[in-house]
């Protein structure tokens, strides 16, 4: 029986996390990024996110098999209660429930911070090909996200144009006098 653990990422995890991400940059349009960032650049990205938001890894038998994090939706004060999510799993670890577990943990932590709305920006093919399928959008829909917008031909990679969709999941109720969102460092256990 395998042991599955979700925990906060550490900067020391960056090399393994980058190894997972590099696959998606080099071989897919799941990431619209063209070049794999350096380890130093990736560590800096992690540090910036960790200043306010959770950055999680999921381990199976002690090996990091995926990661997910939240970050600012737009970067203006009025949007503080909304967060964009990102998730990547080792390509050999997909379809085993790890993504669901990781996203559920992330959503729980964001809810404790006071986040109300979750958003996912997803590459979407007009026609599925070897670089991009509709699996990510279907995964998000399965977790309760709803399609809220499509940007046509907005990403160009591997000499092809791809659409991008935004999906949304509401996890809290807005009201007048909404308490400020707390940094993750104040709510993590």
Model-identified regions with their sequence ranges:
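Glycine-rich phosphate/pyrophosphate-binding loop shared by adenosine-nucleotide-utilizing enzymes
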Residues: 4, 63-67, 162
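A short beta-loop-alpha structural element at the N-terminal edge
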Residues: 5-17
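Conserved GNAT-fold acetyl-CoA-binding loop/helix
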Residues: 18-45
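Acetyl-CoA-dependent GNAT
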Residues: 36-82, 86-92, 104, 109, ...
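Conserved catalytic-core motifs of GNAT/GCN5-like acyltransferases
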Residues: 69, 121-123, 137, 141-160, ...
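Conserved acetyl-CoA-binding loop-helix of GNAT-fold acetyltransferases
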Residues: 95-111, 133-138
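Conserved GNAT acetyl-CoA-binding A-motif
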Residues: 110-132
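Short, cationic low-complexity segments
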Residues: 181-189
């Amino acid at each position: 029986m395998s042991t599955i653990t979700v925990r906060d990422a550490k900067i020391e995890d960056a090399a393994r996390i980058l190894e997972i991400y590099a696959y998606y940059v080099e071989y897919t349009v799941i990431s619209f990024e063209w070049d794999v960032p350096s380890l130093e650049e990736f560590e800096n990205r992690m540090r910036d996110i960790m200043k306010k938001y959770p950055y999680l890894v999921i381990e199976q038998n002690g090996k990091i098999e995926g990661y997910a994090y939240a970050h600012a939706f737009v970067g203006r004060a009025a949007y503080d209660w909304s967060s964009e999510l990102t998730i990547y799993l080792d390509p050999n670890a997909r379809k085993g429930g790890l993504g669901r577990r990781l996203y559920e943990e992330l959503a729980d932590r964001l809810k404790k911070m006071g986040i109300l709305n979750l958003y996912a920006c997803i590459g979407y093919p007009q026609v599925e090909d070897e670089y991009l399928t509709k699996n990510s959008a279907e995964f998000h829909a399965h977790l309760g996200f709803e399609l809220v917008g499509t940007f046509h031909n907005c990403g160009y990679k591997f000499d092809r144009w791809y659409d991008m969709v935004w999906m949304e999941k509401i996890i809290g109720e807005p009201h007048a006098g909404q308490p400020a969102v707390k940094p993750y460092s104040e709510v993590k256990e």
